[in-house]
A protein has these predicted regions:
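HTH DNA-binding helix-turn interface
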Residues: 207-210
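Alpha-helical bundle regulatory/interaction domains
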Residues: 1-175, 181-191, 196-201
Length: 210
């Protein structure tokens, strides 16, 4: 896991954005092999255009849990964005309330280590957080209102994620295949990957069938 993050760093369409409405924070050392970053608003923001409206989401081989917190209406929503194969524009609304966004970005191969469910066949979709992370949602959501800053939310979330981390769900064949593809800069043939991982082409297809 540690070697992979040194070989591969997924980025967004605007990787250098860093302001009050969008900021990426690197996780603690223990979570760094599993979490690409935390991101969101640095603090609650009021009455402004949705900054994401001028942006675009590109396939980044990551999955995101996103919480939108509305301090004016005293409510929140949470959803999971799975792996996307296509780009699409986001936003386009005017935010009149005081709101905040907080999100956890997983590598595609690590989200399952914090979930109670299976992600097979769930690509290009968005789901309610509780469908895949019911225990994490139950513990985290009640705390979101009480901690206004992004840094504060990260502190409590890291503690919960470390408790939820289940490394026994790691698929070694998957990790070996990913390592080989990254090591060869994506030029490896399927037959080469099968030889490296000692699995059949059919089994390899099942492993990558999201």
């Amino acid at each position: 896991m540690h070697r992979l993050i040194n070989m591969y760093r997924p980025i967004t369409a605007t990787p250098f954005t860093d302001n009050d409405t969008y900021c990426e924070i690197t996780p603690c050392e223990a979570l760094r092999p599993y979490i690409r970053c935390f991101w969101g608003t640095k603090k609650p923001v009021s009455a402004q255009s949705d900054t994401a409206s001028s942006g675009i989401v590109i396939p980044d081989t990551c999955m995101d849990i996103i919480f939108d917190i509305n301090y004016t209406k005293n409510n929140y929503s949470g959803f999971l964005c799975t792996i996307d194969e296509h780009s699409y524009p986001t936003g386009g609304t005017i935010v009149a309330d005081t709101t905040a966004t907080f999100a956890v970005r997983f590598y595609a191969w690590t989200a399952i280590l914090f979930s109670e469910e299976d992600f097979t066949g769930r690509k290009n979709s968005a789901f309610a957080v509780e469908e895949f992370f019911s225990k994490l949602k139950a513990e985290l959501e009640p705390l979101l209102f009480d901690v206004p800053t992004l840094d504060g939310k990260i502190v409590i979330t890291e503690k919960l994620l470390l408790k939820k981390l289940s490394t026994n769900r790691i698929n070694n064949n998957l990790m070996n295949a990913i390592h080989y593809m990254l090591e060869t800069n994506g030029r490896a043939k399927i037959s080469d990957i099968c030889d490296y991982t000692s699995v059949s082409e059919r089994q390899l297809e099942r492993i990558f069938n999201y």
